[in-house]
């Protein structure tokens, strides 16, 4: 079996090139595949490989105090969903292009999967306020599944979210808004931006959809969660939609 991981950490990285070289060397040593994005604002990882080698890599990474509290989300597949290993340096570990949404300057309040499940059952939060679940993902992801009744936006990139949300602001004013995404990274920035833009009723779902699946299952969720690899999407039991051996490349005759 292949162990698949998703993890990120917003933390100041003073020398991204140095960290990238070390991460690449360690991941290659453990024969891992996937993608790692590194920026001055942190690190974002999607890695897959043998369970023991995955464990060794993250033990090495979390020995660094900057990443000691990183939350790692796990799932399994029969086959490797990545073709190669890529480690890249980027301006942001998730592109949003908003200076007022830097998790390095603070973090928006969050709600745990268990609490959100209770709110969904009750149709309101603990204070009796109505709920609006805001899907911060792209339209191509949403078609595979989302929370029941979620507000979805017709966007192709995360940077389009502020403009697409503008027409919904009045409807959100009297509700508790819970922003969510695949693993937490986008909803973390989205919630911060919404707060900075004057919305004080916004929370982020801790761990995103995958964290929700992992902790409480699929209650209140319709369908699967899209992922950016050859598994395509995961169901609430974290089982892949596609789990097949990668076809061998063949040359032209």
From Swiss-Prot:
SMART domains in alphabetical order: RHOD
Enzyme class: oxidoreductase
Superkingdom of the organism of origin: Bacteria
Sequence ranges assigned to domain Rhodanese in this UniProt record: 127-221
Residues forming the catalytic site: 181 (cysteine persulfide intermediate)
Any GO BP: tRNA modification
PROSITE patterns: RHODANESE_3 (PS50206)
Catalyzed reactions: uridine(34) in tRNA + AH2 + O2 = 5-hydroxyuridine(34) in tRNA + A + H2O
GO molecular function: oxidoreductase activity, acting on paired donors, with incorporation or reduction of molecular oxygen
Keyword match Coiled coil: no
Keyword terms: Oxidoreductase, tRNA processing
E.C. no: 1.14.-.-
Function of the protein: Catalyzes oxygen-dependent 5-hydroxyuridine (ho5U) modification at position 34 in tRNAs.
Protein family according to the UniProt entry: Belongs to the TrhO family.
Name the UniProt record assigns to this protein: tRNA uridine(34) hydroxylase
Organism annotation: Xanthomonas oryzae pv. oryzae (strain PXO99A)
Source organism phylogeny: Bacteria, Pseudomonadati, Pseudomonadota, Gammaproteobacteria, Lysobacterales
